[in-house]
């Protein structure tokens, strides 16, 4: 019997190619055109997106990207490439490709890269620990479109999420412990997850339940009392209600109530990016301190740390 050759596809959201209004506009147009992300009627959404949102948001968002841009590109791209390279070193007999839902490298280029290595089985690992239709679902949709154009398709193993994976929880817990050892134990550990519209959850997206699962498992691994750990949601967009409580409003409230020391982790982000390094580490720090808080630290994402790479290797091992 011929032995199956397996490849691994690491998938993430994507990023602009440069911190310029033009590059950000191209990226946002692709991102915000996905029905998994915004499911508003196209007749209403297209004029709003092209006539208002892209012209107004692109220059502003480009400045935010410029504030965190790294020598090798956007933080998400730099750390994602490091993850790909480290996992390939950890699994030298297994091709590892990186693909983004929006921007480059695309998911299609990642599939083609693996097929060029003559793999006949692909393990797809979306780097979203908690499933959502707007992230993991978007990867599934694009993968289906890509394979629909192929005469011969490989076997596919698709990892839905890993919200309560033992290695993932332990890696998060060790990261928190290291931060506590460096900065002292805070009055509160705040776990900030990317938000989604509340309507998506009402219609069946189990993302909030998966976030609660991670929060519960992490608090248990740390041995922290429930009142010392809080879960919030960030990065809301548009006018409809999103999952609550909102991170920025919660930090303002906590500062006003006299909570002095907070540390914030974003367990849903496998790699640091604009939403963690600018929104959480900078903007929300100012919100908390401006409301009366005294001390605020952001705990970095797992990025390409050895524990994170080992977690990925163990996660895909069952499918290889």
Swiss-Prot record:
Q: Report the catalytic activity.
A: heme b + 2 H(+) = protoporphyrin IX + Fe(2+)
Q: What Gene3D superfamilies would the database entry show?
A: 3.40.50.1400
Q: Which SUPFAM superfamilies match?
A: Chelatase (SSF53800)
In the UniProt record, does the keyword Acetylation occur?
A: no
* Positions of Fe cation binding: 194, 275
Give the family this protein belongs to, as stated in its UniProt record: Belongs to the ferrochelatase family.
List the protein's name: Ferrochelatase
The gene name on file is hemH
């Amino acid at each position: 019997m011929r032995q199956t050759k397996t490849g691994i596809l690491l998938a993430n959201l994507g990023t602009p190619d440069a911190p310029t209004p033009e590059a950000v506009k191209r990226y946002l147009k692709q991102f915000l055109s996905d029905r998994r992300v915004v499911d508003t009627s196209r007749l209403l959404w297209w004029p709003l997106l092209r006539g208002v949102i892209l012209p107004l948001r692109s220059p502003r968002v480009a400045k935010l990207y410029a504030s965190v841009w790294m020598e090798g590109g956007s933080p998400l791209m730099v750390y994602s490439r490091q993850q790909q390279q480290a996992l390939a070193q950890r699994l030298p007999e297994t091709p590892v490709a990186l693909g983004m839902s929006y921007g480059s490298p695309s998911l299609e280029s990642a599939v083609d890269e693996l097929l060029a290595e003559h793999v006949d089985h692909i393990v797809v690992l979306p780097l979203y620990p908690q499933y959502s239709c707007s992230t993991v679902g978007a990867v599934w949709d694009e993968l289906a479109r890509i394979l629909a154009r192929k005469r011969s398709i490989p076997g596919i193993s698709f990892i839905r999420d890993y919200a309560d994976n033992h290695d993932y929880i332990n890696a998060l817990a060790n990261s928190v412990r290291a931060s506590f050892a460096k900065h002292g134990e805070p009055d509160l550990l705040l776990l900030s997850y990317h938000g989604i519209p509340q309507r998506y959850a009402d219609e069946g997206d189990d993302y909030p339940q998966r976030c609660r699962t991670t929060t519960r498992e992490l608090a248990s691994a740390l041995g922290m009392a429930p009142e010392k750990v809080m879960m919030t949601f960030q990065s809301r967009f548009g006018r409809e209600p999103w999952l609550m409580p909102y991170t920025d409003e919660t930090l303002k409230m906590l500062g006003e109530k006299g909570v002095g020391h907070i540390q914030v982790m974003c367990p849903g982000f496998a790699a640091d990016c604009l939403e963690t390094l600018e929104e959480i580490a900078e903007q929300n720090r100012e919100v908390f301190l401006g409301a009366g808080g005294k001390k605020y630290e952001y705990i970095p994402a797992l990025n390409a740390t050895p524990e994170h790479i080992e977690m990925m290797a163990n996660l895909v091992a069952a499918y290889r």
